[in-house]
């Protein structure tokens, strides 16, 4: 009888057990993004596009995706008539008016937003 009471005292309550098991399974919540925040954007080349010397940039969270397109065009020294295709995580092609901070909230990985770029249609 004493042994049963001892075992009962050592057993954690169901809420404690649930907390421990769910903590390991839940993804880490993203950092709160404000309009003044800067986001780490990581550019990955694909489809024969030249790689950038500097692949990571800190960009304001409140800018449109068009600003990112313009920045990348400048880095690649592309003419206005040359095609450039950008995808988030190789899957999603945002519209130019999307806000970078919102894209980060939805698609960031390891505290950075990965943007794949190509001079030809590579995904989609």
From Swiss-Prot:
Function: Ubiquitin-like protein involved in autophagy vesicles formation. Required for atg8 association to the vesicle membranes. Conjugated to atg5 through a ubiquitin-like conjugating system involving also atg7 as an E1-like activating enzyme is essential for its function.
InterPro entries in alphabetical order: Atg12, Ubiquitin-like_domsf
Pfam families associated with the record: APG12 (PF04110)
UniProt keyword annotations, A-Z: Autophagy, Cytoplasm, Isopeptide bond, Protein transport, Transport, Ubl conjugation pathway
PANTHER family cross-referenced by the UniProt entry: AUTOPHAGY PROTEIN 12, UBIQUITIN-LIKE PROTEIN ATG12
Organism: Dictyostelium discoideum (Social amoeba)
Comp. bias intervals (Low complexity): 13-28
GO CC terms of this entry: Atg12-Atg5-Atg16 complex; autophagosome membrane; phagophore assembly site membrane
Cross-link (Glycyl lysine isopeptide (Gly-Lys) (interchain with K-187 in atg5)): 124
The protein's name in its UniProt record: Ubiquitin-like protein atg12
GO-annotated biological processes: autophagosome assembly; autophagosome maturation; autophagy of mitochondrion; glycophagy; phagocytosis; piecemeal microautophagy of the nucleus; pinocytosis; proteasome-mediated ubiquitin-dependent protein catabolic process
Highest taxon, organism lineage: Eukaryota
Protein family: Belongs to the ATG12 family.
Entry's localization field: Cytoplasm
Molecular functions (GO terms): protein tag activity
């Amino acid at each position: 009888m004493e042994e049963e009471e001892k075992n009962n005292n050592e057993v954690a309550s169901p809420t404690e057990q649930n907390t421990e098991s769910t903590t390991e399974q839940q993804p880490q919540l993203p950092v709160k993004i404000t309009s003044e925040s800067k986001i780490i954007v990581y550019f990955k080349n694909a489809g024969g596009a030249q790689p950038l010397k500097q692949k990571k940039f800190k960009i304001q969270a409140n800018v449109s995706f068009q600003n990112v397109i313009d920045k990348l065009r400048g880095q690649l020294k592309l003419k206005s008539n040359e095609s450039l295709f950008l995808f988030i995580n190789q899957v999603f092609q945002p519209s130019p008016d999307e806000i970078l901070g919102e894209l980060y909230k939805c698609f960031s990985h390891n505290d950075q937003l990965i943007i794949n770029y190509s001079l030809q249609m590579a995904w989609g």
